Amino acid sequence: NMSELRLFYHENGKLKISKSLDTLKKVNLKDLIWIDLNDVSDAVETELEQFLKIYIQEDEEIEEIEMSSRFIQTEDSIVANSSFLLDNYMLEPVSFIIKNGILVSVRDTELKSFNETIKKIYANTRSFPTGYHVLVTLLETRVEYDADMIEDLTDQITSLSKTLNTDDDLDQDILIRIKDMQEKVMVIRQNIMDKQRVVSNLLKSGMFPKDLTQ
């Protein structure tokens, strides 16, 4: 797993990406929309904390169940935690901090919804004036994937159910597989609700840019 730091900012109407924290001192912070930390060192986190005057939670804190979907608002920042589903149905806890319109995302692994979101920002940079816009898109993109996974599982459950014969020994295996898939669907549904809760909390926070609350 590669450690990676990326800063996304606007320059002359285009999206720029930097991999150096020194960029913070060079760009106008109003142009900075997103700092993505993927498995970075404590030193990088500390430097960023001091520069932006934020607090980045430790892995253990983010992983605690009651923390994993929490939403905290102070007078100048928002902290939201949400678990992102991996292809193997494992959950990756991610922490988001927004301050002065800048989003900081903290995670420990590659997430395809993040790569997809970056493509969306490149394709339509003007639609992402702040970190709030980035966060909503990250959550929406993951929810789209989650919905696709549910659809796929539901199709599999349906076709497996059709193969059931009442007096067949194979049925036991099929039933176990169906039950396993149904449990996965529950986990994914939970995840979708979790993302929707974060978005609705963001909208209620009063810090949200007006164009997004429509």
Label each residue range with its predicted role.
Residues 1-213:
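Peripheral, non-transmembrane regulatory/ligand-interaction domains of membrane transport proteins
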